[in-house]
């Protein structure tokens, strides 16, 4: 979308005095969904009742799957494959205890199995599953698959599944694992070369891994839906597992539709088109974002709170980035620090509703935390909202001063303005009794794990979105900073930033490995924030520009049920 310099009559630093102010307004396209996600009361009741009926069948199928897990408990390969399929179908949260027990067994017996095994598929799958769950498995197990020239042995066509699993396993690598760095390049090139000769369902799996996302980086709900369509094509598929996956997916979709309807009604009350016409109207995409962070039914309150907070963050971003004058932003930033309804009279008219909405959402956080019996979390939630405005104002200062930061200076601020630290804290708020005070303080201490997520968010956004941003008055992105600092081409800058992004993924993988003092449930929130970035910013800024592919993802999760 092209940008336009628009002359707007707005309130300046005093709400009683208006001036003609020329503003650089980004011409964002309107909401593509209209009111389609606003459900009537009868629609909500119908969805809820069907989900309740289906849950009876689901509970019976879960018993059957537990029996199958028990039957496979002493068969290494069978157990390995059963756990993998359960996870790929999006069912792992139903069988956490059983999967933990299975993985302990696989870890304890892995060395003996791997020592005698030349099966690349089983070794790679073992490595991936165990590393995903924090077990420190050495990458040296792949040395036996190297050839005399230091490359990897090329399998016959029947061995493609082994190479695919090896490719998936390389996405769990950490810094210093050269064999997996080489293995990633080799397996990717090999799979690309054989893809045209493959037939479904294997071709669909290889294509997905190469052109969408790996198992590690894909969005669990999207990957589960895709895997169902692949899995049912294999003659060996387990009918009970497949039926359970489809029913479970649709039950969750019904729950999510009801949640999105309630959030959409709240957003309609804010009335973005009338009150904030300069901003991106993207509540559906924001709920999709948060759904990527956690989809399980027990986190419904968390999704509601986090969606509202990220919606406020988006409004703040557009206000600071593409509308407010520096003086208006200064006044607003000061009001945020004071955090009081008494500040409303000092704000420009168009900022009053935004400030009031921020206070209302913070009141809602306070109410929910009081219900949960965790009042200490209230301050963390409010501080998370304040941090958005604080960091956006620092960016506005750079823009006002025409400051040209170095790449490292830019990243120091940009890892704050990406908002991921605040969003991670927000997503912890309503996670029951899992997060303790020390876990919130851990996020605020900038550990490598959290900073890796901020780097992934910022660089992925910059790489695909910097050209659009630079068409208006905007601070340079990491691409421009690196290009100017190192006197290099944009292509070289982007390649360097991709390398940094990959290094951040390695740090993220390292943070999962045991021992760790942070509960896995919290670590997965951070990982899932990175996964949603991989989906929404891999080939463009699909939050700002909601094209057919992004709309298709939304439909898969929030419109079309899986055919049963």
Curated annotation (Swiss-Prot):
Pfam families: Terpene_synth, Terpene_synth_C. SUPFAM superfamilies: Terpenoid cyclases/Protein prenyltransferases (SSF48239), Terpenoid synthases (SSF48576). Its EC number is 4.2.3.133, 4.2.3.-. PANTHER family: (-)-GERMACRENE D SYNTHASE, OS04G0344100 PROTEIN-RELATED. Sesquiterpene synthase converting farnesyl diphosphate to alpha copaene and delta-cadinene as the major products. Keywords: Lyase, Magnesium, Metal-binding. Mg(2+) 3 binds at residues 461, 469. Binds 3 Mg(2+) ions per subunit. This is Bifunctional sesquiterpene synthase 1. Transmembrane segments: none annotated. Pathway: Secondary metabolite biosynthesis; terpenoid biosynthesis. The Asp-Asp-Xaa-Xaa-Asp/Glu (DDXXD/E) motif is important for the catalytic activity, presumably through binding to Mg(2+). A motif (DDXXD motif) lies at residues 317-321. It comes from Phyla dulcis (Aztec sweet herb).
């Amino acid at each position: 979308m092209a940008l336009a310099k628009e002359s707007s009559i707005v309130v300046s630093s005093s709400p009683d005095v208006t001036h003609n102010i020329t503003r650089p307004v980004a011409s964002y396209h309107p909401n593509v969904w209209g009111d389609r996600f606003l459900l009537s009361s009868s629609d909500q009741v119908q969805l809820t009742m069907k989900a309740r009926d289906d849950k009876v069948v689901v509970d019976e199928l879960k018993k059957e799957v537990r029996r199958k897990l028990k039957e496979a408990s002493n068969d290494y390969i069978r157990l390995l494959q059963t756990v993998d399929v359960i996870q790929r179908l999006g069912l792992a949260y139903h069988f956490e205890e059983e999967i933990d027990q299975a993985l302990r067994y696989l870890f304890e017996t892995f060395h003996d199995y791997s020592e005698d095994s030349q099966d690349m598929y089983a070794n790679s799958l073992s490595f991936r599953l165990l590393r995903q769950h924090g077990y420190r498995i050495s990458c040296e197990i792949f040395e036996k698959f190297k050839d005399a020239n230091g490359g990897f042995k090329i399998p016959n066509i029947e061995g493609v599944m082994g190479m695919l699993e090896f490719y998936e396993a390389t996405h769990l690598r950490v810094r210093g694992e050269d064999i997996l760095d080489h293995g990633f390049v080799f397996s990717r090139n090999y799979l690309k070369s054989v893809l045209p000769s493959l037939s479904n369902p294997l071709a669909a799996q290889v294509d997905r891994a190469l052109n969408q996302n790996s198992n590690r980086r894909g969005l669990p709900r999207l990957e589960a839906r895709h895997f169902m369509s692949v899995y049912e094509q294999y003659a060996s598929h387990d009918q009970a597992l497949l039926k359970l996956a489809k029913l479970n997916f649709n039950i969750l979709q019904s729950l999510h539709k009801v949640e999105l309807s309630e959030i959409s009604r709240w957003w309609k009350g804010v009335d973005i088109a009338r009150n904030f016409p300069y901003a991106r109207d993207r509540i559906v995409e924001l709920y999709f974002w948060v759904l990527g962070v956690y989809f399980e039914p027990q986190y419904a309150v968390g999704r509601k709170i986090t969606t509202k907070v990220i919606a406020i963050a988006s409004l703040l971003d557009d206000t600071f980035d593409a509308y407010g004058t520096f003086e208006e932003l200064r006044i607003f930033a000061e009001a945020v620090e004071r955090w009081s309804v008494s500040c409303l009279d000092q704000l420009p008219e168009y900022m009053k509703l935004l400030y009031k909405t921020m206070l209302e959402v913070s009141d809602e956080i306070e109410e929910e935390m009081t219900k949960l019996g965790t009042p200490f979390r209230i301050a963390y939630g409010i501080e998370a909202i304040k941090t958005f405005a604080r960091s956006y104002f620092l960016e506005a200062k750079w823009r006002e001063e025409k400051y040209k930061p170095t790449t490292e200076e830019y990243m120091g601020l940009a890892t704050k303005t990406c908002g991921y630290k605040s969003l991670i804290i927000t997503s912890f708020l309503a996670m029951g009794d899992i997060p303790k005070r020390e876990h919130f303080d851990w996020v605020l201490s900038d550990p490598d794990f959290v900073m890796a997520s901020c780097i992934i968010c910022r660089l992925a956004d910059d790489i695909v979105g910097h050209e659009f941003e630079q068409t208006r008055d905007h601070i340079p992105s990491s691409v421009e900073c690196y290009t100017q600092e190192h006197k290099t081409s944009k292509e070289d800058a982007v390649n360097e930033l991709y390398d940094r992004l990959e290094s951040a993924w390695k740090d993220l993988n390292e943070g999962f490995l045991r021992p760790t003092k942070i509960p896995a449930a919290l670590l997965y929130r951070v990982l899932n924030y990175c996964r949603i970035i991989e989906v929404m910013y891999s080939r463009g800024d699909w939050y700002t520009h909601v094209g057919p592919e992004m709309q298709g993802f939304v439909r898969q999760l929030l419109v079309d049920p899986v055919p049963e």
